[in-house]
Amino acid sequence: MLEDAIKDLFGGMVPGELPRRWERFSDVAILPHGSFRGDAWASDDPLWEAVAGALGAKRLARMGEVSGEFRESGVEMLLGEDDWVVRRESGVDYGYAMTRCMFSAGNVNERRRMGEVASEGDVVVDLYAGIGYYTLPALVHGGATVHACEWNPEAVKALRWGLDANG
């Protein structure tokens, strides 16, 4: 489907390598870091609209490197300006600005496990809380008392949103 959309846009040709994978949730598709880079690709709205349409998304972003002492996201918005996303995972809603906060999709089992190992009466200290990867499941599913520590102001905003959204 993506290849067909690119061929339609470029007169039957594919001017460069297409991504073989991407992440899709809500109304956004996130492409790998190296996708659609280089002189062969005209990086303008018609390209991004075609890619988003082929992937069934309204917004399109491209992964970047996590950097800095705050571990800030390097995600770049390609289509759409609103970078706020909500992911629901194991009954927990995580909201964050994807161009400013990272989300570690690979820790899904640990996030779920935190809701299983924490229980009412437990006191948990989450020293690197981020957007609430472990804090929120410990509260939502475990009922523990959690002291969450985070120094990235954008992650703190997202964590506060998650606390409100998850009750």
Task: Describe the function of each predicted region.
Residues 1-11:
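Acidic/glycine-enriched edge-of-secondary-structure segments
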Residues 35, 66, 152:
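Flexible, active-site-proximal loop/turn residues at the rims of small-molecule/cofactor binding pockets
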